[in-house]
């Protein structure tokens, strides 16, 4: 009887432990309340890969909220929509989020999407670049008097180009900016319509130029070319931002958002999912009837995956570098501390 009693007690104790552990796990699993989050994405690029995959693979639903993807092709347009409450999460350049905060907008950075700079400068083949061998910033003198394509007027791409002109002793007035939208329409304006001479743009403009041999990238900031100060900003360049009142009043939703986005990151960083990732992006990134489009798309997506954050952590020192850069280049007119722009509950590292 004693042996039977001991066995029974051991089984009962094990059952209690298992039940308790299961209950704790369930309690710890983030769960929203069925809300819908409008999240910014960009056309014709890999854009907001976290949100696209979270939606397509059911990670949003897993944590009981819906992801609604909305196309807005610049940080400035995304921030306008965020403040106007037509979207809830932007994928934005941290510099313009800081500018919005300095101007009085009640928005905060809630995570990092792409830690490093995503911009590059490409020129059409028939545009002379005599200072190329001088490197940066000397090469910037070749853009004086030229028409420069940017995603939208007032966007992060324009602000960065202004700062690069300054490094060469030039002014914004020394070039003419033209809003050209996404990489695909930028390519048309650059290489086919010739409405612009050069463009500062995110990928895949670099890849399209390389493939068609009609234009080339002369400064690629994604691989460390350009201003040396950019190295110190790695960790906070392209960020997720939201309205402060929204994140403060919806802690469960934000926990669910983080869980869904990090699940998405784990999924698209896993090599075994690459073919499915390409399949998801094929209708999003269309190269039309361009020969070799499938190969170019695969190679580009494969090359860009490592650029995306796995944990959404914001590097605070990098964010401060961006705020200081913004002040120095008159993107903002007052000093802004990183902690003022960053939500205190956002995943972060010093």
For each feature predicted by the language model, list its residue ranges.
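Bacterial N-terminal signal peptides that target proteins for export
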Residues: 1-11
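C-terminal segment of classical bacterial N-terminal signal peptides
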Residues: 17-25
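Short, glycine-/small- and polar/acidic-enriched structural segments
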Residues: 28-180, 195-203, 220-221
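Extracytoplasmic/secreted envelope proteins and their assembly/folding machinery
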Residues: 48, 52, 79, 94-97, ...
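Short, solvent-exposed loop/beta-turn-alpha elements that line the ligand-binding surface or hinge
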Residues: 62, 128-134, 223-233, 305-314
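Pocket-lining segment of extracytoplasmic ligand-binding domains
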Residues: 185-283
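Secondary-structure end/capping motifs
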Residues: 247-331
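Conserved C-terminal helix/tail region of periplasmic/extracytoplasmic solute-binding proteins
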Residues: 319-350
């Amino acid at each position: 009887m004693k042996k039977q009693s001991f066995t029974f007690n051991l089984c009962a104790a094990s059952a209690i432990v298992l039940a308790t552990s299961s209950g704790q796990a369930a309690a710890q699993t983030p769960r929203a309340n069925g809300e819908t989050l409008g999240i910014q994405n960009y056309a014709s690029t890999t854009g907001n890969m976290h949100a696209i995959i979270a939606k397509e693979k059911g990670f949003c639903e897993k944590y009981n909220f819906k992801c609604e993807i909305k196309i807005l092709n610049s940080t400035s347009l995304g921030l306008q929509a965020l403040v106007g409450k037509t979207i809830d999460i932007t994928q934005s350049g941290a510099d313009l989020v800081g500018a919005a905060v300095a101007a009085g907008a009640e928005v905060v950075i809630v995570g990092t999407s792409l830690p490093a700079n995503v911009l590059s400068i490409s020129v059409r083949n028939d545009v002379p670049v005599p200072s190329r061998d001088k490197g940066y910033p000397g090469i910037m003198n070749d853009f004086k008097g030229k028409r420069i394509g940017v995603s939208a007027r007032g966007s992060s791409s324009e602000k960065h180009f202004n700062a690069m002109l300054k490094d060469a002793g030039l002014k914004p007035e020394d070039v003419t900016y033209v809003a050209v939208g996404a990489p695909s329409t930028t390519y048309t304006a650059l290489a086919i319509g010739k409405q612009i001479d050069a463009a500062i743009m995110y990928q895949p403009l670099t890849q399209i130029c390389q493939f068609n041999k009609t234009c080339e990238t002369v400064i690629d900031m994604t691989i460390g070319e350009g201003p040396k100060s950019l190295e110190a900003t790695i960790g906070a360049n392209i960020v997720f931002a939201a309205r402060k009142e929204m994140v403060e009043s919806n802690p469960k939703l934000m926990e669910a958002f983080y869980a869904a986005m990090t699940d998405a990151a784990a999924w698209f960083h896993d090599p075994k999912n690459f073919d499915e990732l390409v399949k998801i992006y094929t209708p999003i990134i269309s190269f039309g009837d361009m020969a070799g489009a499938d190969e170019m798309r695969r190679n580009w997506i494969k090359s860009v995956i490592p650029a995306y954050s796995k944990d959404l952590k914001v590097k605070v020192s990098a964010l401060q570098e961006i705020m200081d850069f913004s002040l120095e280049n008159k993107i903002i007119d007052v000093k802004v501390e990183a902690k003022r722009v960053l939500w205190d509950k956002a995943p972060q590292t010093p």
